[in-house]
A protein has these predicted regions:
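Non-catalytic, conserved peripheral segments adjacent to functional cores
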Residues: 1-108, 116-117, 121-124, 129-160
Length: 160
């Protein structure tokens, strides 16, 4: 019997994403010719052992949990040129749990922030809204040795 993640990949017609995991764009707002649409939405699934590689997007991103296990979302804020002014947020996305739990069903990533994610169980299915709409021209995978070293220091084992 196929895993629930495999069933969802098939049922939602998800394709491999260059950052890792599987996705399908499900909506793009209408826009005037030559204008960037205001919003886009995708389904995004990460199965056990998969991760979204460190990347950034030039637009705000809202992650909405749909089903599965919680997802760890790491968001790196570079800060200024002063050593130690940068910071790493460790967010957990998932169903509302106990009152003292840090798991939330919606998490935000600011435009330009570096991010990576991984499921904390068998799989996590999310919907990601991007405003203004996602464009691959505004997507950057991590390709900076100094930044990768800093991310490994802040978050060991995250593939930086």
């Amino acid at each position: 019997m196929p895993s629930r993640a495999a069933v969802l990949i098939d049922r939602l017609a998800l394709a491999p994403h260059m950052e890792g995991g599987h996705f399908r764009r499900i909506h793009t707002a209408k826009a005037a010719p030559g204008q960037r649409p205001a919003l886009s939405a995708i389904h995004f699934l990460l199965a056990a052992g998969e991760r979204s590689e460190w990347h950034r997007v030039d637009a705000e991103e809202a992650w909405h949990f749909v089903e599965g296990d919680p997802l760890e979302l790491l968001v790196y804020h570079p800060g200024s040129d002063y050593p130690g002014s940068d910071r790493l947020e460790r967010l957990r996305l998932g169903p509302l749990g106990e009152p003292d739990s840090d798991v939330q069903p919606i998490r935000m990533v600011p435009a330009g922030a570096w991010q990576t994610s991984r499921p904390l169980g068998a799989y996590a299915l999310c919907t990601c809204l991007v405003a203004p709409a996602f464009e691959f021209a505004g997507f950057t995978l991590l390709d900076d040795d100094a930044l990768a070293a800093r991310l490994r220091e802040l978050a060991p084992g995250t593939g930086a």
